[in-house]
C-alpha cells in the first residue's frame, strides 16, 4: 500500500515537472506570452476619441450646362447684323476663329457696329431674390389657372427690354411650369424646344439637362445658378421658347391617364377642353 502511494506521488510530480506553466483552473491556453504583464490603463476622459458625427457637407458651385446658341447667320458670314427683328444670338464669343477674323476684317473697313451687339448686364442680386425685390401689388392667388394666364400673357411679349426683376420672375415661372410636366415628357419638351428655335441636335444634351435639372431642382439652387451663369440674351431666348411651347406640349404620357382624362372633355368639345375665360386683366406694357 505504501509502495503504491509513493508510485502515484512520483508520477504526479513527473507530470507537474513536464508542464510547469499550465494553469489547471483554465482550460484555454493564453494566446500571448504568459510572462507579459498587462500594462494597459483605462483612458482618461480627455483621451477618449469621440467620432465627429456632424460633418458639414462641402457644396461646390453648381455646374450649369452651356446655353443653347442659335448664332445669327449674318454674323457667321462676317457681317454685323443691323436688323431690329433678328432674335438670333449675336454674342461674339459664339463665333469660331475664322468667322471672328472675317468680322474684324470687315469691321476695320468702316462698318458701323450694331446696337444688337450690346447686352446689358444682369442684376446679380436676383440670383436668390426675396419678396422685397419684386413690386408688390394686388396680385391674385397663385392657382394653376393663374399660372396658365401669366404664361399665355408673356408668351407673346418681346422680352428684350424687360427689367431684370420681371425676367428673374419669368425664369421662376419656367421652373414651376416645368415641374408640372411628367418626367417622361421632358424628352418631348426638349425636342419641341429644338424645333421651335431651329437648333441642331448638337444642342439637345444641354437643353435636356436644363429641363431635367429644373424638374428636380430643390430649393431653387439650379435656377439661381442659371441666372448667375447664363447671359441675359440666352435667358431671354430660353424663356421665350419655353413659354411658347409649354402650353401646347402634352404634359402626360401614360395611356391610362390620358384616356381617363379624355372622358372628362365636355360633350360639345371633341378636341380640347374649352378655354377658360380670362377674368384677370394683365398689363400689356413691358417696362
Curated annotation (Swiss-Prot):
The keyword Magnesium does not apply. Keywords: Activator, Host cytoplasm, Host-virus interaction, Inhibition of host innate immune response by virus, Metal-binding, Phosphoprotein, RNA-binding, Suppressor of RNA silencing, Transcription, Viral immunoevasion, Viral nucleoprotein, Virion, Zinc, Zinc-finger. Pfam families: Transcript_VP30. One of its GO terms (cellular component) is host cell cytoplasm. The keyword Metal-binding applies. One of its GO terms (biological process) is symbiont-mediated suppression of host innate immune response. Residues 94-112 are annotated as: Oligomerization. Residues 26-40 are annotated as: RNA-binding. It is found in: Virion; Host cytoplasm. Residues 1-52, 268-287 are annotated as: Disordered. Phosphorylated by host. Phosphorylation negatively regulates the transcription activation. Phosphorylation and dephosphorylation take place in viral inclusion bodies and are largely influenced by the presence of NP. Dephosphorylated by host PPP2R5C; this dephosphorylation enhances viral transcription and is mediated by NP. A zinc finger (C3H1-type) spans 72-90. This is Transcriptional activator VP30. It comes from Reston ebolavirus (strain Philippines-96) (REBOV). The lineage of its organism: Viruses, Riboviria, Orthornavirae, Negarnaviricota, Haploviricotina.
